[in-house]
Every structure is written in structure tokens, then in C-alpha cells.
């Protein structure tokens, strides 16, 4: 069983090579479902988990026939029936400088001692955050249970969040374990819910329900638990019916207001690519290759 609320008829496996996550594609929809699959530890991530998550997200990014990513957590845990989206970094593998590969991890078999040393302490969940942020398609956090610490920050960086009315809980524990997300997890949360409320979330370490999270603006909608994945799929199908170019440009336009020069570069790069597709730009290219002056006079100066 993938997850208790997973519909096996709606999805097909992309690969079974992952240990800590599952990766499925919609049978009849251009949507993928990527899920943490460590329910017994509330879907906490270790370095190998992050490697797999990055690989799956990057694969989805490159698929021209995939328009939306659902990011969720499988469950419940067999031991106590608990649900989780992600409980953040697995503290049992946290070393002095970050999260450490163990000898039974694939990356723990690295022969190059310099690579092993560089991997001694990882915090590369931040690379996943950036990948989600710059993904040219919507990423929806589908939260069936606990979103804690680094898992809380992951849902924050996603474009949208849907949460289980009954089981979703939002808790920021970073200061409790001597950690802090000084980037998207905190600053972007403040953009979503306001400075005072975001500081409360981090400074108090209070648990919030799905309804409370929706009221403050960090969750789009609280959904009955049994309907959560079906509603997420419906939202994804609505979004993938839109213009891919418009959706990509809209996401980058929303990002640009908060992402500084990097956001401008991403948006401008996409605008340049659109310009390349015009006859006017192609005339400039052809004139250069043919060693002649471009005939731009036939193109109007739009206003």
C-alpha cells in the first residue's frame, strides 16, 4: 500500500528505484505525485531522502507533458496510525555540521575521500527548496498530517497548500533543536501571513490546525481527510488545463517581487525565450548568419 488515501487506479509508478519516496504519474492527467515514504518517523528526511526528492522533482521539471507536481507524505504509520507530510530533518542522523549519510546509504559508499568529506554534513534540503521555487510549473503541498520544522518550510515554499481538516498540523520547531530557516521558511512565510504572525509561528513553537493555517493564509484550503488527494488532483487538473506558457510566466512573475535580481533574471530569461520565438527575432538571427543588415523596418513599434 502506498498510502491509505492513495487511489491506485489514478496513478502509475514512474520508478521503484527509490527507498525513501514514491513517485507516480497520473494515468490520464499531466500530473505527478511525489511522496515522502518514511511514515514511521513522520516522513522525516535524511540525506538520501533529499537526494531522491531532488532527483524526482528535477525529472518532473524536465517532462514537457507534466504540468503540475503534488508533493505529499504517505501514511499512516503502522505503529500508531499517525499521519505526516514531513517532520523535517531526521535528528538521529544530524551531525555537528549537518545531516550525515550512514554507511548503508547509497552516497555513503562514495570512494572519493574528498567527496565523502564534503558530504560529511548536508543541508541540501535548501537545494530542494530552490528547485521547487524555480520549477516552471505549480508545485502543490498536499499535507495529510504533521508539517514540522524543515517540513513546514517545504510547504511554505510550494505554490499552493491543501491540508487535511482532521490530521494536518503545522508546527515550527527550528529554535527547539538549534536550527533556523533564515530564507524561504521564515522570510517568505512572513510575506504570506505577515511579520507578526510569522514571528509567532517560529518564536512560540505553537501547533496550528489546518483551519487555523487557512485562516492566517499559509494554507489555501482545509479539506476532509478522505477527500484530500482527490481534491488535490482536481486542482492539478484545473491548472494543467491552462496555457503552459502563461502559467510559467505567472509563477515567475509572482516570484519576482520577492526574489530580487535572481527573480528578475529568471523572469527575464523566460521573456527572452518568448522573444526568440517571434519572426522579428528570427530575422535578426538570419541577418547575422547571412551577413546582411536586418530588415527590422517591417516590424511595428508596439505601444
What are these regions (language model features)?
Residues 1-79:
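Conserved CoA-thioester-binding segment of acyl-CoA-metabolizing enzymes
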Residues 269, 277-281, 287:
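Interdomain hinge/lid region at the active-site interface
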Residues 34, 71, 90, 154-156, ...:
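Hydrophobic/aromatic residues within transmembrane alpha-helices
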Residues 38-39, 242-243, 291:
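Short loop-to-helix capping motifs
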Residues 125, 186, 195-198, 247-250, ...:
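A general structural signal for well-ordered alpha-helical segments in protein cores
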Residues 130-244, 278:
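Crotonase-fold acyl-CoA enzyme core
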Residues 80, 163-168, 219-266, 273, ...:
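C-terminal long alpha-helix characteristic of the crotonase
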Residues 41, 73-128, 176-178:
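Glycine- (often His-adjacent) and acidic-residue-rich active-site loop
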Amino acid at each position: 500500500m502506498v498510502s491509505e488515501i492513495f487511489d491506485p487506479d489514478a496513478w502509475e509508478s514512474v520508478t521503484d528505484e527509490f527507498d525513501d519516496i514514491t513517485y507516480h504519474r497520473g494515468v490520464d492527467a499531466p500530473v505527478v505525485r511525489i511522496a515522502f515514504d518514511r511514515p514511521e518517523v513522520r516522513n522525516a528526511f535524511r540525506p538520501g531522502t533529499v537526494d531522491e526528492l531532488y532527483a524526482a522533482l528535477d525529472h518532473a521539471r524536465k517532462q514537457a507533458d507534466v504540468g503540475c507536481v503534488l508533493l505529499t507524505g504517505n501514511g499512516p504509520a503502522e505503529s500508531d496510525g499517525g499521519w505526516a507530510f514531513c517532520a523535517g530533518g531526521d535528528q538521529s542522523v544530524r551531525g555537528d555540521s549537518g545531516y550525515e549519510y550512514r554507511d548503508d546509504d547509497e552516497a555513503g559508499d562514495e570512494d572519493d575521500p574528498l567527496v565523502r568529506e564534503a558530504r560529511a554534513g548536508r543541508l541540501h534540503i535548501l537545494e530542494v527548496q530552490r528547485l521547487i521555487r524555480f520549477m516552471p510549473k505549480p508545485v502543490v503541498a498536499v499535507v495529510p498530517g504533521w508539517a514540522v520544522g524543515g517540513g513546514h518550510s517545504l510547504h511554505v515554499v510550494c505554490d499552493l497548500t491543501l491540508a487535511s481538516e482532521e490530521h494536518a498540523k503545522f508546527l515550527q520547531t527550528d529554535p527547539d533543536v538549534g536550527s533556523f530557516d533564515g530564507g524561504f521558511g521564515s522570510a517568505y512565510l512572513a510575506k504570506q501571513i505577515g511579520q507578526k504572525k510569522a514571528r509567532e509561528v517560529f518564536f512560540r513553537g505553537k501547533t496550528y490546525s489546518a483551519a487555523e493555517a487557512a485562516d492566517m493564509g499559509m494554507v489555501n484550503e482545509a479539506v476532509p481527510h478522505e477527500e484530500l488527494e482527490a481534491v488535490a488532483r482536481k486542482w492539478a487538473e484545473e491548472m494543467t488545463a491552462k496555457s503552459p506558457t502563461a502559467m510559467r510566466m505567472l509563477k515567475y512573475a509572482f516570484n519576482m517581487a520577492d526574489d530580487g535580481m535572481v527573480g528578475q533574471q529568471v523572469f527575464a530569461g523566460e521573456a527572452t525565450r518568448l522573444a526568440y520565438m517571434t519572426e522579428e527575432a528570427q530575422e535578426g538571427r538570419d541577418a547575422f548568419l547571412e551577413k546582411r543588415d536586418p530588415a527590422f523596418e517591417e516590424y511595428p513599434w508596439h505601444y
